[in-house]
């Protein structure tokens, strides 16, 4: 979208905070239905971020595939589970939560140090090269393929990892 700078920054901060709140809702809410709805909110916020970065096709695919199909399937599977397992008393912190938060914090610190220590010169050069190549391409599907493999590679892979973790969690909760 071609928005003025302050409006673009406000929407970026608003959607980023929506992602954080939704992600915390997925992890911290005791009811799996509410966690699934929170996951849907996170996926919609990611789709809106794609729209904000002028990638309308990826945003539409995100909405149709992840929100429209996968998240609805997760909600449908969770609704068939026995609800008596989830009591009303909510234990906020257990040993497993502490170990999980320690592992996640360690992974986050390693990821941040890797991002800060990496020389991004080659990535910028590759992007510029693909922008030069992009003018010679005829079809939009070739341009989408180049953008998915260069500019939007990291967000595309991150959402697939988030989806994989969510599906593994839904399967493990359904088996119990």
From Swiss-Prot:
EC numbers, comma separated: 7.1.1.-
InterPro entries registered for this protein in UniProt: NAD(P)H-Q_Oxidoreduct_6 (IPR050290), NADH_UbQ/plastoQ_OxRdtase_su6 (IPR001457), Nuo/plastoQ_OxRdtase_6_NuoJ (IPR042106)
Topology with respect to the bilayer: Multi-pass membrane protein
Catalytically driven reaction(s): a plastoquinone + NADH + (n+1) H(+)(in) = a plastoquinol + NAD(+) + n H(+)(out); a plastoquinone + NADPH + (n+1) H(+)(in) = a plastoquinol + NADP(+) + n H(+)(out)
Keywords assigned: Chloroplast, Membrane, NAD, NADP, Plastid, Plastoquinone, Quinone, Thylakoid, Translocase, Transmembrane, Transmembrane helix, Transport
Superkingdom of origin organism: Eukaryota
Transmembrane segments: 10-30, 32-52, 61-81, 92-112, 152-172
Keyword Cell cycle: no
GO cellular component, one term: chloroplast thylakoid membrane
Localisation per UniProt entry: Plastid, Chloroplast thylakoid membrane
Disulfide cysteine pairs (residue numbers): none
GO molecular function, one term: NADH dehydrogenase (ubiquinone) activity
Primary subcellular site in the record, as a coarse category: plastid
Function in brief: NDH shuttles electrons from NAD(P)H:plastoquinone, via FMN and iron-sulfur (Fe-S) centers, to quinones in the photosynthetic chain and possibly in a chloroplast respiratory chain. The immediate electron acceptor for the enzyme in this species is believed to be plastoquinone. Couples the redox reaction to proton translocation, and thus conserves the redox energy in a proton gradient.
Family from the record: Belongs to the complex I subunit 6 family.
Subunit-level organization: NDH is composed of at least 16 different subunits, 5 of which are encoded in the nucleus.
Classification via PANTHER family: NAD(P)H-QUINONE OXIDOREDUCTASE SUBUNIT 6, CHLOROPLASTIC
Name under which the protein is recorded: NAD(P)H-quinone oxidoreductase subunit 6, chloroplastic
Organism ancestry: Eukaryota, Viridiplantae, Streptophyta, Embryophyta, Tracheophyta
């Amino acid at each position: 979208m071609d928005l003025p700078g302050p409006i673009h920054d406000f929407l970026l901060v608003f959607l980023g905070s929506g992602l954080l709140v939704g992600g915390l809702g997925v992890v911290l809410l005791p009811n799996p239905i509410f966690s699934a709805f929170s996951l849907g909110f996170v996926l919609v916020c990611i789709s809106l971020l794609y729209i904000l970065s002028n990638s309308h096709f990826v945003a539409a695919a995100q909405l149709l595939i992840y929100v429209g199909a996968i998240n609805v399937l997760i909600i449908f599977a969770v609704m068939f589970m026995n609800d008596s397992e989830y009591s009303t008393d909510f234990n906020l912190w257990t040993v497993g939560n502490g170990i999980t938060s320690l592992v996640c914090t360690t992974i986050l610190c390693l990821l941040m140090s890797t991002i800060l220590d990496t020389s991004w010169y080659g990535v910028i050069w590759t992007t510029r090269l693909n922008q030069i190549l992009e003018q010679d391409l005829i079809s939009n599907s070739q341009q989408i393929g180049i953008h998915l493999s260069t500019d939007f590679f990291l967000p595309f892979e991150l959402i697939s990892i988030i989806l994989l973790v969510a599906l593994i969690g839904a399967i493990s909760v359904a088996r119990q």
